[in-house]
Design a protein with these regions (language model features):
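Glycine/threonine-rich flexible loop motifs
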Residues: 1-9
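Short, conserved loop/helix-junction motifs that constitute active-site signature segments
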Residues: 12-18
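Active-site-proximal catalytic alpha-helix in oxidoreductases
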Residues: 61-69, 90, 94-126, 135-149, ...
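Beta-strand segments within the central parallel beta-sheet cores of soluble alpha/beta enzyme folds
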Residues: 129-138, 190-194
Length: 226
């Protein structure tokens, strides 16, 4: 979709004047960002890839994290524009680096949710109140932003999407494709993506990614509740 908007018929490449800067805040494959940037540059159009993290709550309150790839001078010029909607804006390297950073972010989030789901399912199956387990561990080394955001959702059975499983599958697929291209191995990412695909097959593709817990609950025949 981004390629079509940028390079397609009646796209940015056909209408934008030289000197225009495209700040692409979507989450796409790093290779796609580089290809789009190269085509635009031939027409005198610069580009930053600037995906965001934080989900709907941080978008609403203007505290998103923005990770940016592209020319540093262009980044500096438009920093204040991006900072107006963000809590942090970090230049991570050349074009495509923003989306590599976003993929790394999505890997960490997915694996955190999976680990949380395993732990709370274990507690529930062992007859221990998962809410008390959560309260006990959240202040220690196992505590995290993901744990605090997603554990209450699971225990309240609130899977209203802040970030849908469908979208996380897309990001993990891009992470795996990128890893194959650079020769990295992501075995845990591959495993979690299979779990999410199974949930999508069960009709949970539009649920919040915290519904990953349902995969573990189904195996253990329990429900993680307060």
């Amino acid at each position: 979709h981004v390629k079509e908007v940028a390079l397609g018929e009646n796209g940015i490449i056909e209408g934008a004047k030289p000197g225009t800067v495209l700040i692409d805040m979507s989450s796409i494959a790093p290779l796609a960002s580089r290809e789009i940037s190269e085509a635009l540059k031939a027409k005198g159009i610069d580009m930053l890839d600037a995906p965001v993290s934080g989900g709907e709550p941080k978008a609403i309150d203007g505290t998103l994290s923005v990770m940016v790839g592209g020319d540093k001078a262009i980044f500096d010029k438009y920093y204040d524009l991006m900072k107006a909607m963000a809590g942090s804006v970090v230049h991570t390297g050349e074009i495509g680096a923003g989306n590599v950073t976003k993929l790394a972010n999505q890997v960490i989030v997915a694996l955190n949710i999976a680990a949380m789901s395993e732990a709370l399912t274990l507690a529930t199956k062992a007859g221990v109140n998962p809410d008390l387990v959560y309260q006990a561990i959240r202040g220690g080394l196992a505590g995290s932003t993901v744990l605090d955001a997603k554990a209450p959702m699971v225990m309240d059975r609130n899977f209203k999407p802040g970030f849908r499983i469908d979208l996380h599958i897309k990001d993990l697929a891009n992470a795996l494709d990128t890893s194959h291209g650079v020769g990295a191995q992501l075995p845990l990412t591959a495993a979690v993506m299979e779990m999410m695909q199974a949930l999508r097959a069960d009709g949970l593709g539009t649920a919040d990614h915290s519904a990953l817990a349902c995969y573990y609950e189904k195996l253990a025949k329990v429900e993680v509740t307060r």
